[in-house]
UniProtKB/Swiss-Prot annotation:
Lineage: Eukaryota, Fungi, Dikarya, Ascomycota, Saccharomycotina
Keyword match Protein transport: yes
Name of the molecule in the record: Serine/threonine-protein kinase atg1
Positions of the UniProt region annotated as Disordered: 403-478, 590-610
UniProt feature, compositional bias: Polar residues: 455-467
Source species: Vanderwaltozyma polyspora (strain ATCC 22028 / DSM 70294 / BCRC 21397 / CBS 2163 / NBRC 10782 / NRRL Y-8283 / UCD 57-17) (Kluyveromyces polysporus)
Gene this protein is translated from: ATG1
Function description: Serine/threonine protein kinase involved in the cytoplasm to vacuole transport (Cvt) and found to be essential in autophagy, where it is required for the formation of autophagosomes. Involved in the clearance of protein aggregates which cannot be efficiently cleared by the proteasome. Required for selective autophagic degradation of the nucleus (nucleophagy) as well as for mitophagy which contributes to regulate mitochondrial quantity and quality by eliminating the mitochondria to a basal level to fulfill cellular energy requirements and preventing excess ROS production.
Length: 994
């Protein structure tokens, strides 16, 4: 194939999420023969072509169809713009960029020797099979056979070449942000020079007889002056600076940390820090306290250790600076002593030209890679970042994933990948060479997964959720979820189904992991998880987590400095305090009985209503009480330690003699706080629009938290229905009595929550960022639901999660404005607890949305394959009506568009009607109260003005309907009606009607 009449594309050498990289060459006048081929695809007979040093190229082809939103297109344009501006001998050169109506073609400098990982991970095979590198390693043998470290000549050569390129980038105020061995390409030596003098005259540094290092992949690069700080989290975790891992702002010094990790790996053949996820990695780095562990297998000089220590300094302010690095004696050391003799020069030059003329990429010399090429036709699985999904790539809970086909084993490393999304999958199979910077989050490799969710403005064919989801999807008929609450038998059936689905959710994940071509429990594989990971996290997620961490830290300090005595004896104290003190700062804990026992006031006949934790829900589709309680409980435990009082079983006499530092939170206060958020709907409605000050911030956040919670609960119902359900051959009757709901006081939801707490936390992270190739033959194609229904449910769930994220982002923005404008950094316990809950839900929704995004893409892939198969057996006899059909499809899409307003409206009315039926029957009045409150919150959301200042607005605007005045009036009437019912119900409950 010929591009623009002068570039011939040959075989593929790499493939990524959005781009394919191919080898090629530039046509000279004799090849073209004066024919105007322009953009036509022309086959060229090049069997007898003699490849020269000047005509070989690498072509990165990016189909426009893959760039489905503006952000992804901008990322590519930024890379092109940067590469056009920079020309340096140790940076991969962009020769030209060609654009057609269907594709972008980046014509780039070709590096035939792969990347630095080949010399480290594949050294033994290279020494045996590659003619040029065999001679080079013979001249500079590795220091030890026990590890993959390189000879000092290699180390200093590449250190100086890397330093030279970074010095140039800093002169242009550029920061690369993804320095790692996979992005350090190696070009064949002796291409434009014949001796050491001509080598240096061309601007090269180092040793002329060694492969030449060139920095590639500027997809994460950006202009960043020395005094500026960046907030976007990106790069590969194993090589990422700790300040980025910890969501902090960072400057160009982050690149120096990456240089330190690369330098260490060249010395010892492995990164300095390894972990199974980025959080553990950060903990290890911090725990090391600037003490780097050096292996006894190989001794390196003290100067190298000192430089590594200076580069791998935890605090960026204490880390070595660029100028000091550039002036380091190792960086400026004269390496002429490593230059070879003239006769050796001639031998190496002949072998170098032979390699070039053979037109063979480095992986083609390796026996293991040749075998893979025969099996897979040189196709590699793609690892993508986090993309970047547009503005958000999921950054947490990175776990390995798998291919279940035996043949998929070859997909990971069959060739060198010019896409920076593709990296080695294990220590012995690392041949992926990164040229392509299309770090498109949302697809992943077998042993490695990326998060990335995209929130973008794309049409409703693919939704985006990075820090959130890549574009979402077309539209189909809305499906409302029926509430099975008309009878106990129906509720038992629904309960069994939900529990079975939760179990299958975990089972599905385990099955996929079980099919991995390498045992993920193997230490060597787990060490590489992060090495293959890309991460991009945009500002909104960083702000949410940073603010929550700051407030949590202050909460801990307040807790440590406060001594709390036991009170006299009133277990109802907390409820009164919460009701009367909105800005609760400190209060006295009280002794409480087990959460399963009822509480009464001491001695008085005044008994308080059972808390939501005690009043188990029997409406199966409602899940606010214990879920919110559990979430808040987890947050409070993280903040203030255990919420169980050490001496709660002690007698009152003993308690009176104790005056010690106690946790500020205990179970009863926790339950009261949970109740107030949802059940105080009449007090909190409209509070999010009042002026913000220290007295009103809690009410504002409670209002927004309640709104976010009811939408999130609805999303969870939809989400649970997308989990594959195995046949219920073992009915609930056969299950142990303690594993099923026996009567109307049983709590199926509570049991499900216990299961889901485990399964969601372990399953979703392993699915994030997975490539379609690794998913296409797994769960989705064998779901118990029809594809259409599953597709619809996934779409509805992701819309609801995005709405939740929008509300939570607004809550955190309001909190941030108040927090940083306030003179006092003193927050109440309740406020702190709310912020932690909002943060937890925010991160959880990102994970759910990422999973759904992958599932949606997977379903679309299955559907496309099915359509292709059907089209092969269908005669084309309807050409005359194509236009009519197309128009009808467009009309259908308009009618089938899913709007979050309609989902919430239908759900609110459904809940209130169900509650009304139960109220008439006199059953579960406390749960009816909760149902009415939930319905009111949902309707209240519909009257809110659209949120304009959060990162999810673009996404929301595509699936949000504009309500006219008539719609609003109808909603207000329903609110008034339901509020009256709620008021009457509460009077009935207070009179003992429950």
């Amino acid at each position: 194939m010929i591009i623009s009449g002068k570039y011939v594309i040959e075989k593929e050498i790499g493939k990524g999420s959005f781009a394919t990289v191919l080898k090629g060459y530039i046509i000279d006048d004799n090849d073209n023969n004066g024919n105007d081929t322009n953009n036509e695809d022309v086959e060229v007979n090049d069997d007898k072509r003699k490849y020269t040093t000047r005509n070989q190229i690498a072509v990165k082809a990016v189909p426009r169809s893959k760039l489905k939103n503006k952000k992804l297109l901008e990322n590519l344009e930024v890379e092109i713009a940067i590469l056009k501006k920079i020309k340096h001998p140790h940076i991969v050169r962009l020769i030209e960029c060609e654009r057609t109506s269907t594709d972008f073609y980046l014509i780039m400098e070709y590096c035939a020797l792969g990347d630095l990982t080949f010399l480290i991970k594949k050294r033994q095979e290279i020494m045996e099979n590659h003619p040029l590198l065999k001679s080079v390693f013979k001249r500079f043998p590795p220091p030890s056979k026990n590890h993959n470290g390189l000879h000092r000549a290699f180390i200093l050569n590449y250190l100086q070449q890397l330093s030279s390129s970074l010095k140039f980038l800093r002169s242009k105020n550029l920061v690369h942000r993804d320095i790692k061995p996979q992005n350090l390409l190696l070009a064949t030596p002796f291409v434009d020079y014949h001796d050491s003098k001509s080598f240096h005259d061309l601007g090269y540094v180092g040793i002329s007889s060694l492969p030449i290092l060139k920095i590639a992949d500027f997809g994460f690069a950006r202009f960043l002056p020395n005094t500026s700080m960046a907030e976007t989290l990106c790069g590969s975790p194993l090589y990422m600076a700790p300040e980025i891992l910890n969501y902090q702002k960072y400057n160009a010094k982050a690149d120096l940390w990456s240089v330190g990790t690369v330098l260490y790996e060249m010395c010892y053949g492995k990164p300095p820090f390894k972990a199974s996820n980025h959080l553990e990695l950060y903990k290890k780095i911090k725990k090391a306290n600037n003490t780097i562990s050096y292996s006894n297998d190989c001794e390196i000089e003290d100067d190298l250790k000192d430089l590594i220590n200076a580069l791998l300094t935890f605090d960026p302010n204490k880390r070595i600076g660029f100028q000091e690095f550039f002036d380091n004696k190792l960086v400026i050391e004269d390496l002429s002593k490593y230059e070879v003799a003239n006769e050796v020069y001639s031998e190496l030059e002949l072998k170098s030209k032979s390699v070039l003329e053979s037109n063979m990429f480095i992986s083609e010399y390796l026996p293991s890679e040749k075998k893979k090429d025969d099996t897979d036709n040189m196709i590699i699985s793609n690892l993508s970042t986090n993309d970047r999904i547009n503005n958000i790539t999921i950054f947490s809970n990175i776990l390995p994933t798998v291919n279940e086909n035996e043949n998929d084993k070859t997909n990971d490393n069959s060739t060198t990948n010019y896409n920076n999304n593709d990296n080695e999958n294990n220590d012995n199979n690392n041949t992926n060479h990164n040229y392509n910077n299309d770090k498109v989050n949302n697809k992943s490799n077998d042993n490695n997964e990326k998060s990335d969710i995209n929130r973008s403005n794309s049409n409703y064919k693919q939704h985006s959720t990075k820090q959130t989801t890549n574009e979402l999807i077309p539209n189909t008929n809305t499906i409302t979820t029926n509430i099975n609450d008309n009878s106990n038998s129906e509720m038992n059936s629904q309960s069994a189904r939900m529990m079975q689905k939760s179990k299958n959710y975990k089972s599905l994940r385990n099955n996929k992991l079980r099919n991995s071509k390498n045992d993920i429990i193997n230490n060597s594989n787990s060490d590489l998880i992060l090495e293959k990971e890309y991460v991009v996290v945009e500002k909104k997620s960083v702000e949410v987590n940073t603010l929550a961490d700051e407030m949590a830290q202050i909460g801990q300090i307040n807790n440590l400095n406060y001594k709390v005595p036991y009170p006299s004896r009133s277990p109802t104290l907390a409820g009164n305090v919460l009701q009367n003190n909105e800005s609760l700062q400190h209060y006295q804990p009280f002794s409480v009985k087990s959460p399963r026992t009822s509480l009464s006031s001491n001695g008085s006949g005044n008994s308080r209503r059972a808390s939501l934790v005690d009043r188990r829900l029997s409406i199966s589709s409602l899940n606010p009480s214990n879920a919110l309680s559990r979430a808040l409980g987890v947050a409070s435990t993280k903040l203030f330690g255990s919420n169980v009082l050490p001496n709660q079983n002690a007698g009152v006499g003993n308690a009176n003699n104790i005056n010690t530092s106690m946790p500020l939170l205990n179970p009863q206060v926790f339950q009261d706080l949970t109740e107030n958020i949802l059940l105080r709907v009449d007090q909190l409605q409209g509070k999010d629009r009042i002026n913000i000050d220290s007295n009103s911030i809690v009410q504002i956040l409670e209002s927004l938290a309640a709104k976010a919670f009811v939408v999130h609960s609805f999303a969870e119902v939809k989400f649970s229905q997308t989990i594959p359900l195995k046949s219920l051959s073992t009915s609930t009757v056969n299950r142990p009595a303690n594993d099923r709901r026996l009567n109307d006081r049983g709590c199926a939801i509570e049991e499900d929550d216990n299961i889901q707490t485990e399964t969601y936390d372990t399953y979703i992270p392993s699915l994030k960022g997975r490539s379609l190739s690794s998913l296409s033959q797994t769960s989705i194609c064998s779901q118990d639901l029809p594809h259409g229904e599953l597709y619809q449910l996934s779409k509805e769930a992701i819309i609801l999660y995005m709405k939740t994220l929008s509300i939570l982002a607004t809550a955190m923005q309001i909190t941030s404005n108040w927090w940083y404008q306030s003179n006092e950094k003193n927050c109440s316990l309740r406020l702190n607890l709310l912020v932690q809950w909002i943060r937890d839900k925010f991160n959880e929704c990102l994970e759910r949305a990422d999973f759904l995004r992958i599932q949606i893409l997977e379903l679309e892939e299955c559907e496309n394959k099915s359509n292709e198969l059907n089209s092969d057996h269908t005669d084309v006899e309807t050409s005359g009506v194509n236009e009519t059909v197309h128009n009808n499809d467009n009309d259908a899409n308009e009618e089938d568009q899913i709007y979050v307003e309609k989902l919430l409206y239908d759900r609110a009315l459904e809940i209130s009607r169900t509650a009304a039926k139960l109220e008439i029957q006199g059953d579960h009045l406390n749960n009816c109260e909760l149902a009415y409150a939930t319905s009111l919150w949902m309707l209240e959301i519909l009257l809110d003005d659209r949120i304009e200042d959060d990162n999810f607005n673009e996404f929301s605007s595509k699936n949000s309907a504009v309500l006219d005045d008539q719609d609003r009036e109808i909603i207000k009437k329903y609110i008034d009606s339901i509020a009256n019912r709620l008021k009457a119900l509460r009077e009935k409950i207070s009179q003992g009607g429950s």
